[in-house]
Curated annotation (Swiss-Prot):
Residue spans of biased composition, Polar residues class: 179-190, 220-235, 534-573, 632-658, 713-727, 1205-1219, 1376-1387
Modified residues (Phosphothreonine): T1264, T1343
Subunit structure: Interacts with the cylin/CDK complexes CCNE1/CDK2 and CCNA1/CDK2. Interacts with BZW1, CASP8AP2, CREBBP, MIZF and YY1. Interacts with the RUVBL1, RUVBL2 and TRRAP subunits of the NuA4 complex. May also interact with GAPDH, NME1, NME2 and STIP1.
Post-translational modification: Phosphorylated at Ser-771, Ser-773, Ser-1096, Thr-1264 and Thr-1343 by CCNE1/CDK2 at G1-S transition and until prophase, which promotes association with histone gene clusters and stimulates activation of histone transcription. Also phosphorylated by CCNA1/CDK2 in vitro.
Biological role: Required for progression through the G1 and S phases of the cell cycle and for S phase entry. Activates transcription of the histone H2A, histone H2B, histone H3 and histone H4 genes in conjunction with MIZF. Also positively regulates the ATM, MIZF and PRKDC promoters. Transcriptional activation may be accomplished at least in part by the recruitment of the NuA4 histone acetyltransferase (HAT) complex to target gene promoters. Required for early embryonic development.
Main location: nucleus
GO molecular function ontology, one term from the record: transcription corepressor activity
Name this polypeptide is given: Protein NPAT
Region ranges (Mediates transcriptional activation): 263-339
Domain LisH intervals: 3-35
C-alpha cells in the first residue's frame, strides 16, 4: 500500500534528482508528511543518508515503467510464448500433412491397421477354433474361386467367418457364386470382407436407401436364417422370383411401417454410436488405407453401417431378432424355415455377413448360380439342383451352423436337398426315385419354397448362361458334367431311390450331421447310414438308417447339383458345394450305405463321421463329403483314393462304400461305391484304396467317395477292413476334402472313378476345385481321383494345371487362414490360390496328405491336373499335387516312403487311380514342405513347392520322381519348407524327375523315413505296425516336423507332381499340433502302414528303412534330449525347434545327409541361415536347387543380405554367408553321426544362429528382417529359428504371410524391424538370446523347459553376449551331443509328446513370439 509519505518521498527524491534545492527545502518544510526530514534537512535542502525511492525505484523510473506498460496495453504485440506455440503447432500440422501425403506413412498406417485387424481376426480365429475348419473350408472355396481376386475375398471372408463355422459355409456359397464374377467379388468382397459378416451385410444395406438399409439388415438376418440365397438377399433379383417377392414384401413392410424403421434405427443406433466410430476408422483404413480422409467421409456418408464392428452388427441383429415387432418380417423370410432360421440367425448372421461381403457380386453370383442351375438343368435334364443345392446347402449349412432344431433343420435341409434331389432326380432319375424324390421334393417345396423358386429361377436362362460360362471354362461339356453328375447321381440316386423313402427326413439331417459333428459319431454309426446321422445327430436327430438313406439321397441330389455346380462353377460352386455338397456326398454315401446295409454302408457314415470328426469343425469334413459327389467325377474319389491309398487299403471297403453311392446295384460289394458318398473312409483308408477293385467299381460308378477324407479311426475300425485306418483319433482328424466339379469325367472314366474312390483324406478340409475348362474338368477329375487330396486343396484354386502349380500355390492365407492352419489341418491356410491357376484344365487339388500318398491327415495335398493331360482325356490328367501338411509333420515324412514305394504298389496307394495314374503322371506333383514360408513362384501364398514326380497322382504311380527336396527339411525343419518353395519345379519337372530320381530319392528316402517317423510319431498309437517302427522315428520327426516336411515326401512319384505341403503354424499350432500331429500321424500312420511296404524297397535302398526305423527309434530316444535342447534353446519356439531337430535327426541320418548335401545344401544353408526369411529360404530351398535356382539365388541373396545385415557369423554353422552354413551343414552331414548333429546343427543354426546372431551382432534389427515372416510375426528370432517352416506354416498359414510372395519373405521381417525399431528388435533379440541360452542350458542339463525357463529368468540378467556365445557353442555341442544322445537315448515318443505339450505351455500355440517373450516377464 502506497502511503502519502511514500509519495512525498518519491516527489522529494525527484526534486533532489533535478537539483531543485530551494523547492526541496520548501517542500520538506511545508509537507506534513516529511516532518522527520525537515528536522534533518540541510541548508542545501538535501536529506543526507536518506532513500528517497520506492522499492529502489525513483519517481521517474516508476513513471517510465508505467508509461511503457500503458503503451504495451494499447499495442497488439503477440507474446513470444504464443508465437513459439503457434510455430510448433504449425510445424506439427505440416508434419501431419506431409505424413498423410507420404506413401510410407500411409503404408505404415495401413500395415498397422491391417496388422491390428489381422491380429484381431486371428484372435477371433483362435477363439473360434471350434469352427475353424469350416472357416478353412470357406477360405478354400474362396480360393477355389476361379479368379485370383476371389481368393482375396475368400481370405478376408474367411477371417470374419473364422469365428463362425456356419457363416463360413454360407460365405463359401456366396463366394462360389460370386467367383464367376471374380471382379465384383473382389471389389465388394475385399472391402466388405474386412468387415465381419454382419458388417458385410450392412455393406449391402448401406448401398441401399436408408429405409431399405434398415430393412436389409433385418432381411439379412432373416435371410441368413433362410437359405443362402435368402442371405444373399441384397441381390433379390438373383434369387427366385418368390424370394424376390419375399424380400420386396419385407421391404414394403419395413418401409410402410415407420415403427419398424424407428425400432431398427433405434437398435442400430444403440450399438452404432459406440461401435461405428471405432470400427469404421480401422475398416476404412483397411479398405482405403491410402486415402483415409476421403474413405472415412465416403464410408461414413454412404455405408457407415458397413464399418460397424461385427459385434455391433451382431448385437443389432440380435436386438432386431429378439424384437417381436419384427417377427412378421422374419416370418416372411422363413418360408417354413422359421425354426431353422431362428436357430441360425445368430449363427447365420455371421455367415450372412460373410455373404454380404460378396453381396454385390452375389447378384451376379446368384445369376451365376441360376446359370449353373440352368446349365445343370440342361446338362442334367434341366434340373436346377445346382442353385437349389446352393441354397439348400446354405440352409443346410445354416442348419448345421445353428446346430439346433436338428430335426427341423434336417427337414428344411432335406427339403432343400430334396428339391435339388427332386430336380436332379426328376431330370436325371425321375423314374428312379419318384417316391423319394417326392418326399424330399415335397419337403423342399413346403419348407424351401424360396429354394424352389430359386431353383426355378436357376433353370432360367440366366442361370444357364452363368452355368454355361462356368461349365465351359470348368467342364468340357456341361452335358458331360451333367452326365457325370447323372452317373454318379444316378448311382447315388438309384441307391437313394431305393433308400430315399427311408431317408426323406434325413437327407438334410445327414448333411447337417456331416457338417455338424459327424466325425466320431458317424464312426459309431458307421454300421448304418444312421451312423452318418449319428454324427450329424447333433445337427439333426439321428435318423434311422432309412433316414440316413434319405439324407443321403437328398445329399446325393445336392451332390448332383454340386457336381454339376462343381463342373460349372467348380471353384465357387465347388467351394460352396464342397461345403454343402461335402455333406451331400456324405449323405449320399450313407444312402448308398443304406442301400448296402453292409460294411460299406456303415463305412460311409464313418467316413462322414470322420470327415465331420476331422472337421468338426467339420465343415471341412463336410466338404470332404462334398467331394464325394465330385468323386463321382472320379476326381474326388481319385483324390480320396490318392490321399488314402494306404488308408484305402486299410479301409478299402469303407472307401468303396463311401465311394459308390453311384450304382445302387453295387451294394455291399459295391458297398464301397455307396461308401463313396462320405467315403466313410474319411480316414485315408476310407477311400477304399485297399479295396482297389471295389474302389475301381466305385470309380466307374463315378464314386462320390470323393470325400470322406479323414474317416476317424473309429470309422476305419468300424470298417472291419480298415485296420489300417489306424486308430486315427477322430477328434484329432481334420479332413479336408476337395470336390472337383468334373463329374462327367468321373462318370465317364471308370479309371478316374476308381482313382476318386481311392482318394480319402483323413484330415482334409473339403475344398472344391472346379475345372477351369471342360478339358480340365476331365483332367481335373482325374487329378482329384488321383489326389482327392486335391479336396484338400483347401484354399488352392485350381487353375492352369501347368501354371497352376505356381498359380495354384498362390495360396493367399490370411489371418483366418492362419487360424485355419491352426485348425489342425494344414488346410487351415486355406491358401487362396489365385484362381489364376485355371489354365486350361489345370486344377490344384489339395489332397489330404493323410491320404495314401501323403501320410499325414493334417497335411493337405494339392494336386493340379494339367490341361494338356486333360486333353488326353478324363483319365489323362496331369496333376499337380500340393501337399499341405496341416500341422502334422508326419505327413511329409511318411508319404515319401509310401510314394517311393507307391510306384510298385501304385494300386495299393492309388488303387483306383492307378489306371488313372498314367494320366496323373502327366501332371506334376509339387510337394511343399513348409506351407508358410515356401512359396510357389506363381503363388501368392508361401507354399513350399517341390516337384514330387511326373506322376500327377500323388497316390498313384511311382513316387520315383517325387521331388522331396522340401523333404530335406526333415533335416532342417525350416529348410524343408523352403526347399519345396520352387514353383519352378514345374519347368524343371523333367530335370527334377531326373534329379529326384537320384537326389530326390535320397531326399525322399530321408523325408520318407522322416515322414514315416513323423506320421508314426503322431499316429504311433493308432498305427502300430509301421507306426511303431516309423512311429518311433517319426515320433521324433513328426513332432519336430510338426507336419511341415511330412507332406512333401508324401508324394514321391516320378511324374512331375507338385505337392504343396502346407505346414500349419507351429507356434500357433503348438497346442493344436498335438492334435494335428496326432491326426496327421494317424493318417500318416495309415499311409505308412500302407506305404511302409511300398516305400520300404526304395527307402531301404536309399535310406535302409530298417536302419531308418532304428534311427527313428534312436532319434526318438534322442528326441527328448533334442527337445530339451530345443526347449532350452528357445522355450518359445522349442516346439518348432524340437520339431526341427527331431526332423533333422529323425530322418535317416544318411538320408538327411544326402538330402541336405544333394538337395539341401543350399536349402540347409538357407534353412539354417535364412530360416528366418522363410519365404526367401523357401523359394531357394527345394525347388531352388533344381528349378528354383533363380529362387535359390534370390533366397541366397536375401540370406546373404540377411547375414550381412545380421553381420552375425556368430555361429559358425550360421556362417554369415549361406555358404558357411552350408559348409557346416555339409560337414556335419557328411558323417552319419554328423548327420544327426548336422540336423541338429541345422536346427541350432536356424534356431540358435538367428537368435545368437542377433545377440552376438547386436544387430537384431537386421536379423529381424533376415528372420523374415517368422520374425515379423514372432519378432523373436528364436521363434523363427525354432521352426521357420513350421512356424511359417502356423503363422503364415494362418496369416497373410503365406500370401506374401516368396521374395517378400524378407518383407515381413523388415516391417517388424521398421515398425518396432532397432531398439525393440535388439530387445527382442536379447529376449530370444535369453530363451535360446536357457534352451541351450536345458539341452545341456536335459532339464524340463519350465525349469529352464525359470533358470533363464533368474539368469536372464547375466550378460547376454556371454550367453549368446556360450549358447552358440552349446548349441553346436548340444546338437552334436544331442545327435549322439538321440541315437543313444531311448526317450519314448510319449516323452516327446509331453515335452511338446510343455513347449506349448511355454510358448502357446496362438501366441506370437513377442507375446510369448512378454509373457516371460524378463527383467532385463
Amino acid at each position: 500500500m502506497l502511503l502519502p509519505s511514500d509519495v512525498a518521498r518519491l516527489v522529494l527524491g525527484y526534486l533532489q534528482q533535478e537539483n531543485l534545492t530551494s523547492t526541496c527545502q520548501t517542500f520538506i518544510l511545508e509537507s506534513s508528511n516529511l516532518k522527520e526530514y525537515a528536522e534533518h534537512c540541510t541548508d542545501e535542502g538535501f536529506i543526507p543518508a536518506c532513500l528517497l525511492s520506492l522499492f529502489g525505484k525513483n519517481l521517474t523510473t516508476i513513471l517510465n515503467e508505467y508509461v511503457a506498460m500503458k503503451a504495451k496495453e494499447t499495442s497488439n504485440d503477440v507474446p513470444t510464448i504464443m508465437s513459439s506455440l503457434w510455430k510448433k503447432l504449425d510445424h506439427t500440422l505440416s508434419q501431419i500433412r506431409s505424413m498423410h501425403s507420404s506413401p510410407g506413412f500411409a503404408a505404415h498406417q495401413r500395415a498397422r491397421t491391417r496388422n491390428g485387424i489381422a491380429e484381431i481376426k486371428r484372435q477371433r480365429w483362435l477363439a473360434s477354433q471350434a469352427a475353424p475348419v469350416s472357416s478353412e473350408l470357406l477360405v478354400l472355396p474362396y480360393a477355389s474361386g476361379q479368379f485370383t481376386t476371389s481368393p482375396l475375398v475368400a481370405t478376408q471372408a474367411v477371417k470374419p467367418t473364422g469365428p463362425i463355422s456356419t457363416p463360413v459355409r454360407s460365405n463359401i456359397v456366396v463366394v462360389n457364386q460370386s467367383q464367376p464374377q471374380s471382379t465384383v467379388t473382389n471389389t465388394a468382397g475385399e472391402s466388405l470382407n474386412i468387415i465381419p459378416g454382419p458388417q458385410e451385410r450392412k455393406t449391402q444395406t448401406s448401398l441401399m436407401s436408408p429405409g431399405r438399409r434398415k430393412s436389409e439388415s433385418q432381411k439379412k438376418s432373416l435371410t441368413s436364417s433362410g437359405p443362402h440365397s435368402s442371405r444373399n438377399f441384397q441381390d433379390p433379383n438373383a434369387f427366385a422370383v418368390e424370394k424376390q417377392m419375399v424380400i420386396e414384401n419385407a421391404r414394403e413392410k419395413i418401409l410402410s411401417n415407420k415403427s419398424l424403421q424407428e425400432k431398427l434405427a433405434e437398435n442400430i443406433n444403440k450399438f452404432l454410436t459406440s461401435d461405428s466410430s471405432v470400427a469404421q476408422v480401422p475398416k476404412q483404413t483397411d479398405s482405403n488405407p491410402t486415402e483415409p480422409e476421403t474413405s472415412i467421409d465416403e464410408l461414413l456418408g454412404l455405408p457407415s453401417e458397413i464399418h460397424m464392428s461385427e459385434e455391433a452388427i451382431q448385437d443389432i441383429l440380435e436386438q432386431t431378432e429378439s424384437d417381436p415387432a419384427f417377427q412378421a418380417l422374419f416370418d416372411l423370410f422363413d418360408y417354413g424355415k422359421t425354426k431353422n432360421n431362428k436357430n441360425m440367425p445368430q449363427i447365420s448372421s455371421q455367415p450372412m455377413e460373410t455373404n454380404s461381403n460378396i453381396v454385390l457380386p452375389e447378384e451376379t453370383n446368384l445369376t451365376i448360380k441360376s446359370s449353373f442351375e440352368t446349365e445343370e438343368s440342361d446338362g442334367q435334364s434341366g434340373q436346377p439342383p445346382f442353385c437349389t443345392s446352393y441354397q439348400n446347402e446354405d440352409v443346410l449349412l445354416n442348419d448345421l451352423k445353428s446346430g439346433n432344431s436338428h430335426d427341423v433343420l434336417p427337414q428344411e435341409s432335406q427339403e432343400n436337398f430334396s428339391q435339388i434331389s427332386s430336380n436332379i432326380q426328376k431330370k436325371t432319375f425321375k423314374t428312379a426315385i419318384p417316391a423319394e424324390q417326392k418326399c424330399a421334393l415335397d419337403i423342399t417345396l413346403e419348407s424351401v419354397s424360396n429354394l424352389s423358386d430359386f431353383n426355378q429361377r436357376g433353370s432360367s436362362a440366366e442361370c444357364n448362361e452363368h452355368c454355361s460360362e462356368l461349365f465351359a471354362s470348368q467342364i468340357p461339356t456341361e452335358a458331360e458334367v451333367a452326365v457325370g453328375e447323372k452317373n454318379s447321381l444316378s448311382a447315388d440316386i438309384l441307391s437313394q431311390s431305393q433308400y430315399q423313402p427311408d431317408q426323406p427326413s434325413v437327407p438334410v439331417t445327414s448333411f447337417v450331421s456331416l457338417g455338424g459333428e459327424t466325425n466320431d459319431k458317424n464312426l459309431v454309426l458307421s454300421g448304418k447310414n444312421s451312423q452318418l446321422l449319428s454324427q450329424s445327430t447333433p445337427l439333426t436327430t439321428k435318423p434311422s438308417k432309412s433316414q440316413l438313406c434319405e439324407n443321403s439321397n437328398n445329399i446325393i441330389k445336392v451332390k448332383t447339383n454340386p457336381q454339376a455346380s462343381e463342373s460349372a462353377d467348380s471353384s465357387e460352386t465347388a467351394n460352396r458345394k464342397t461345403e454343402t455338397n461335402t455333406v451331400s456326398p456324405a449323405a449320399a454315401q450313407p444312402q448308398a450305405d443304406c442301400q448296402d446295409n453292409s460294411p460299406l454302408q456303415s463305412k460311409p457314415p464313418p467316413g462322414i463321421g470322420e470327415s465331420l470328426g476331422v472337421n468338426v469343425t467339420e465343415k471341412i469334413e463336410i466338404h470332404l463329403e462334398e467331394p464325394a459327389p465330385s468323386d463321382k467325377q472320379l476326381s474326388n474319389d481319385a483324390a480320396s483314393v490318392d490321399l488314402n491309398p494306404t488308408e484305402s487299403k486299410t479301409e478299402p471297403l469303407q472307401s468303396a462304400s463311401a465311394q459308390e453311392p453311384e450304382p445302387p446295384s453295387v451294394k455291399d460289394g459295391d458297398t464301397i461305391f455307396l461308401s463313396l458318398s462320405e467315403h466313410n473312409s474319411c480316414e485315408e483308408v476310407a477311400l477304399v484304396l485297399g479295396e482297389g477293385n471295389p474302389v475301381k467299381n466305385n470309380n466307374s460308378l463315378s464314386s462320390e467317395s470323393g470325400g470322406s477324407v479323414g474317416v476317424s479311426p473309429e470309422t476305419q475300425n468300424t470298417d472291419g477292413k480298415t485296420s489300417n485306418s489306424t486308430e486315427v483319433d477322430a477328434s484329432s482328424i481334420v479332413s479336408l476334402k476337395i470336390i472337383i466339379s468334373d463329374d462327367p469325367f468321373v462318370s465317364s472314366d471308370a479309371e478316374l472313378n476308381s482313382a476318386v474312390s481311392s482318394i480319402s483324406g483323413e484330415n482334409l478340409p473339403t475344398i472344391i476345385l472346379s475345372s477351369k475348362s471342360p478339358a480340365k474338368n476331365a483332367e481335373f477329375v482325374t487329378c482329384l481321383s488321383s489326389e482327392e487330396t486335391a479336396s484338400a486343396v483347401v484354399s488352392v484354386e485350381v487353375g492352369d494345371s501347368g501354371s497352376m502349380e505356381q498359380n495354384l500355390l498362390v495360396l493367399k492365407p490370411e489371418e483366418p487362414m492362419v487360424n485355419n492352419t491352426q485348425n489342425e489341418d494344414g488346410i487351415a491356410f486355406s491358401a487362396n490360390v489365385a484362381p489364376c491357376v485355371p489354365k486350361d484344365g489345370g486344377y490344384i487339388q489339395l489332397m489330404p496328405t493323410t491320404s495314401t500318398a501323403f501320410g499325414n491327415s493334417s497335411n493337405i495335398l494339392i494336386a493340379t491336373c494339367m490341361t494338356d493331360s486333360t486333353a488326353l482325356g478324363p483319365t489323362v490328367s496331369q496333376s499337380n499335387v500340393v501337399v499341405l501338411p496341416g500341422s502334422s509333420a508326419p505327413m511329409t515324412a511318411q508319404p515319401p516312403q509310401q510314394q517311393l514305394q507307391t510306384p510298385p504298389k501304385s494300386n495299393s496307394a492309388f488303387a483306383v487311380s492307378q489306371a488313372v495314374s498314367p494320366n496323373f503322371s502327366q501332371g506334376s506333383a509339387i510337394i511343399i514342405a513348409s506351407p508358410v514360408q515356401p512359396v510357389l513362384q506363381g503363388m501368392v501364398g508361401m507354399i513350399p513347392v517341390s516337384v514330387v514326380g511326373q506322376n500327377g497322382n500323388t497316390f498313384s504311380t511311382p513316387p520315383q520322381q517325387v521331388l522331396h527336396m522340401p523333404l530335406a527339411a526333415p533335416v532342417c525343419n525350416r529348410s524343408i519348407a523352403q526347399l519345396p518353395i520352387p514353383q519352378k519345379s514345374q519347368k524343371a519337372q523333367g530335370l527334377r524327375n531326373k534329379l529326384i530320381t537320384g537326389k530326390q530319392v535320397n531326399n525322399l528316402t530321408n523325408l520318407s523315413s522322416l515322414s514315416e517317423a513323423c506320421h508314426t510319431q503322431r499316429t504311433e498309437a493308432s498305427d502300430k505296425n509301421i507306426a511303431t517302427e516309423l512311429g518311433k522315428k517319426m515320433e521324433d520327426t513328426t513332432i519336430s516336423l510338426s507336419g511341415e516336411r511330412v507332406a512333401p515326401p508324401s508324394k514321391p512319384f516320378e511324374s512331375h507332381r507338385r505337392v504343396l505341403c502346407f505346414d500349419s503354424t507351429v507356434s500357433s499350432v503348438a497346442n493344436t499340433q498335438g492334435s494335428l500331429y496326432k491326426m496327421t500321424s494317424e493318417n500318416k500312420e495309415k499311409k505308412e502302414a500302407s506305404f511302409s511296404h511300398l516305400d520300404s524297397p526304395i527307402l531301404s535302398s536309399t535310406l535302409k528303412p530298417p536302419p531308418n526305423n532304428a534311427i527313428k527309434r534312436e532319434r526318438e530316444k534322442t528326441v527328448p534330449k533334442i527337445l530339451s535342447k530345443s526347449e532350452t534353446a528357445s522355450s518359445r519356439h522349442t516346439t518348432v525347434k524340437e520339431v526341427q531337430s527331431e526332423k533333422k535327426v529323425s530322418p535317416t541320418e544318411v538320408a538327411l545327409e544326402s538330402l541336405h548335401k544333394a538337395t539341401a545344401n543350399k536349402e540347409n544353408e538357407l534353412c539354417g541361415d535364412g530360416e528366418r526369411p522363410k519365404n526367401a529360404d523357401t523359394s531357394k530351398l527345394p525347388g531352388g536347387q533344381q528349378n528354383g535356382s533363380l529362387r535359390n539365388e534370390k533366397a541366397i541373396a536375401s540370406l546373404q543380405e540377411l547375414t550381412k545385415k545380421q553381420a552375425t557369423p556368430s555361429n559358425n554353422k550360421n556362417a554369415t554367408s549361406v555358404g558357411g552354413t552350408v559348409k557346416d551343414q555339409k560337414q556335419e552331414q557328411s558323417k552319419p553321426a554328423s548327420s544327426l548333429i548336422g540336423a541338429e546343427i541345422l536346427q541350432d543354426v536356424p534356431i540358435h544362429s538367428p537368435a545368437n546372431r542377433s545377440a552376438d551382432t547386436d544387430l537384431p534389427v537386421p536379423r529381424t528382417p533376415g528372420s523374415g515372416a517368422g520374425e515379423k510375426h514372432k519378432e523373436e528370432p528364436s521363434d523363427s529359428m525354432k521352426a521357420p517352416a513350421s512356424r511359417r506354416c502356423g503363422e503364415e498359414g494362418s496369416m497373410p504371410r503365406v500370401m506374401i510372395p516368396p521374395v517378400t519373405a524378407d518383407l515381413p521381417a523388415c516391417s517388424p524391424a521398421s515398425e518396432t525399431g532397432s531398439e525393440n528388435s535388439v530387445s527382442m533379440a536379447a529376449h530370444t538370446l535369453m530363451i535360446l541360452s536357457r534352451a541351450a542350458i536345458a539341452r545341456t542339463t536335459a532339464t524340463p523347459l519350465k525349469d529352464n525357463t525359470q533358470q533363464f529368468r533368474t539368469s536372464s540378467r547375466s550378460t547376454t553376449k556371454k550367453r549368446k556365445i556360450e549358447e552358440l557353442d552349446e548349441c553346436e555341442r548340444n546338437s552334436r551331443t544331442s545327435g549322439k544322445n538321440l541315437a543313444n537315448s531311448s526317450v519314448p515318443m510319449k516323452k516327446k509328446k509331453i515335452k511338446k505339450k510343455k513347449l506349448p505351455s511355454s510358448f502357446p500355440a496362438g501366441m506370437d513370439v513377442d507375446k510369448f517373450l512378454l509373457s516371460l516377464h524378463y527383467d532385463e
